[in-house]
Amino acid sequence: MSKKINYFSRNFADVRQELISFVKQYYPAIFNDFNDASVGMMLLELNAAVGDMLSFHTDRMFQETQIDFAQEKSSVLSMARTFGLKIPGKRASVTIADFSVVVPVLGDTFDVSYAPIVTRGAQISGAGKVFETSEDIDFSSPFTVGGVPNRLVIPNLDNNNNIINYTLTKRELVINGVTKIQSRIVTDSDVKPFLEVILPDDNVLSINSVVALEGTDFTTNPSNADFFNEDDRWYEVEALADDIVFIPDNTKLSDNATIKPGKFKRVNQRFIKEFTDNGFCKLIFGGGTEDISSLCDFDVNKSLVNRIGDFINNNSLGLTLSPNKTLFISYRVGGGADTNIGPNTLTSINNIIVNVNGPNATTNQQVINSVTVTNPLPALGGKNEPSVEEIRNLVRYNFSSQE
């Protein structure tokens, strides 16, 4: 005799009652003691508890696939990736900082030969937060690198109203965060499509530059020039299928503040940046290759080998890394809502390189020692990583925002 099973019971009480009815109907001679203290009732209730738990987890798993009801951040992030939406991490605050130095007099103005240059990446701090400059600060120029006037010249007078020196103040943009460099030796096992490299920090703000240099025995980090060498550099793109990047040219000025001089370049060495569910930054490199060494083993015409290589080597998603190289990743960490600090807070100089090329070494050192800094404006724009509700709304309205 076929047995009818009711599949609509989902909670403990319903499953328990269904099991009792099932036993009464099909096994009345084997078991008929439904007292709460009986062994048979214990077995029935154990099965009812298992059924209740299975129903609960089935509902929870289905709930995590629905954008309106998902509770786990990993589930919402997974749906965001499915829809091609990149969820950002923490945001860094920005502010304006006044860098001041004292330079000697020359005639009726200051001696420009003692005007220093502060290299990019100068670090200042206050309230436990560190900020960095993104460009060189040239005190001999009245303009920023972008051509915006930003220098103030203040004469310093003695008791007889004679000018004894000048204070030069340059107003520059500083961004919260600290630059770090991570290195990794590329081995043969790393030469594979879509290699993933996860950075060790969970508060990565941005990737400054990525280069792969020949050799595996580096004892020092590359210089700024090495990091921006176009032959060794790997470029960040929105998607691996994007093969054209814009490279700014800081040596040229624009008469329009909304236009940045530069050039577009087609590149094969590219990567994308994503964030894991735990907030760590992950770099994913390309999946193609330009290696035709396997074809060269055959005794065929060299030009024919190259033509065959053009067909079988697909670089549409970028190149894979090459072995026996060292990968250097320059990136910035920091950010968060607590980096929004008040004015006149950034008064400490942490790490700064000041170049003064005046004729007198003692005066050069005096100029270097005179560097001071403060922020006349509060730091704004810092934000924590998006919450689950923020990500949910970003995913929900992602398609409508593209119309």
Per-region residue spans from a language model:
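Signature of Asx- and small-polar-rich beta-strand/turn repeats characteristic
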Residues: M1-E403
